[in-house]
A protein has these predicted regions:
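Bacterial Sec-dependent N-terminal signal peptides
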Residues: 1-27
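Alpha-helical cap/lid subdomain in secreted, periplasmic
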Residues: 2-6, 25, 52-62, 78-228
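Hydrophobic alpha-helical membrane context
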Residues: 15-18, 47, 191, 216
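Serine-esterase "nucleophile elbow" of acetyl-processing enzymes
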Residues: 17-72, 77, 82-91
C-alpha cells in the first residue's frame, strides 16, 4: 500500500473511531439491577429487550445503552455484595433497582428471606453508594407473588409492607419510584375478572409473561425517559 493510501486509510479509521467514541459518550448507560425477573428481561420478549426494540423504532438507540444485571435468587443483600463489580465499575448514568420478591418469597419457601429492618438497611446502603458516584436512581416495588385481586394471595401482606418501605425510601431519598405493585394490582383489577392466581401478567405467580413484560417496560420507560 502506497503512502498516500495509507494516510487516507488511517484518516478514515480515525474518523470512524472518533465518531463511535462521540456516540458512546452521548449515550446514557442504564443498568437494570435485580433478581431472576431482571435476568430474564434481556431474553427475547423480556422488558429490556422490548425497551431496546422500542428505542430503535423511535430512533433513540443513539441516546441509551441498556444493560441487565439480574441474578436468579438474589435478595437485597446479594445486590449489595455484588454492586461494585456488576454496577459501579461499569459507570452507569442510571440504575433501576427491582428487588424484593425473593426477600419475601424465600421466607415461605426456604426460610431464607430478609427481615424488614435488614431489607431497609441494605437498600439504603446501596442507595448511598450509588449517590456517592452521582448515579441517577429509580426504584421499583415488588409486583406480585400471586395475582388474585381480593387480597387472598398468601404473601400480599408482606409484599405490601416491603413495598411501603421502598415507597418511603423513594420519598425520603428523593428518588424516582416505579410502583409496579400498584400498577400490577390496577391491571389485574381491570383484566383478571376470574380472580386467577397466575396467567394474567405472570407465568407462575412471579415471573413475567408477555403482558407482564410489556407492562413493566411501559412503566419503567415512563420514568427513565424523564430522567435527565
Amino acid at each position: 500500500m502506497s503512502k498516500p493510501f495509507k494516510l487516507i486509510f488511517l484518516s478514515i479509521t480515525l474518523t470512524i473511531l472518533f465518531t463511535s467514541f462521540l456516540l458512546m459518550q452521548g449515550k446514557k448507560k442504564v443498568i437494570f439491577f435485580g433478581d431472576s425477573i431482571t435476568q430474564a428481561a434481556i431474553k427475547p420478549g423480556g422488558y429490556i429487550d422490548l425497551m431496546n426494540k422500542m428505542l430503535i423504532s423511535k430512533g433513540l438507540d443513539k441516546d441509551y445503552e441498556l444493560e441487565g444485571a439480574g441474578v436468579s435468587g438474589n435478595k437485597i443483600y446479594d445486590l449489595y455484595l455484588r454492586m461494585e463489580e456488576d454496577v459501579l465499575m461499569k459507570k452507569p448514568d442510571i440504575v433501576i433497582i427491582y428487588i424484593g420478591v425473593n426477600d419475601v418469597w424465600h421466607k415461605q419457601t426456604s426460610g431464607t428471606g430478609t427481615d424488614a429492618d435488614k431489607f431497609q438497611k441494605f437498600y439504603l446502603a446501596i442507595i448511598k453508594k450509588l449517590k456517592k458516584d452521582n448515579i441517577k436512581i429509580a426504584i421499583c416495588t415488588p409486583a406480585v407473588i400471586g395475582e388474585k385481586t381480593d387480597y387472598s394471595n398468601q404473601l400480599d401482606g408482606d409484599l405490601n409492607k416491603y413495598s411501603n418501605i421502598i415507597r418511603s425510601i423513594a420519598k425520603n431519598e428523593n428518588l424516582q419510584l416505579i410502583d409496579l405493585r400498584a400498577s400490577f394490582l390496577q391491571y389485574n383489577i381491570s383484566n383478571n375478572t376470574e380472580n386467577k392466581e397466575l396467567g394474567v401478567l405472570t407465568s407462575d405467580r412471579v415471573h413475567l409473561n408477555e403482558a407482564g413484560n410489556k407492562l413493566v417496560n411501559d412503566e419503567m420507560w415512563k420514568v427513565i425517559s424523564e430522567i435527565k
